[in-house]
Amino acid sequence: MNLNIVEYPDKKLREKSKEVKSFDSKLHELLDSMYPIMMNTNGIGLAAIQVAFPLRALILNIPDEDGEQPDENLIEMINPVLSNYSGEIVYQEGCLSVPKFYEDVKRYSNITVNYQDRDANTITLEAEGLFAIAIQHEMDHLDGLLFIDKLSYSRRKKFEKEYKRMQKDKKNG
């Protein structure tokens, strides 16, 4: 499957993803195709909508203490739902769909998420810190939200200005 990352301001990123009902070879092929894209772009998470598939599916591979992302750390979440959350944490986030822009975002520091794996098994997972942040970031994509939507008015204006400048620079080579 030949996939490309959808970049802001593409309207596809604003689509609300649909619940996955068929846990079949098409879903498996999509998940298998997403992983190398995420890893080759130095990502830690990727939602299906970011490769133009509006399905409630995402993948994560959080770096370990040594900064490594071994394949066995891959987590695939289908139809994830937050069931519990607490605390706050501010972290500088970036996004494969909003390249070269990073900004502080406030999120829950501890979460519990219920989801299904690629074989429709139900799983409950507790996460904290960067892992919790990444899950929330990717889950936002499933609802058509980007991390820049969480910025204050002034920070959002700063982003829009920087984004326009970057686009202009890109055109002028």
Residue ranges and their predicted role:
Residues 1-173:
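Positively charged
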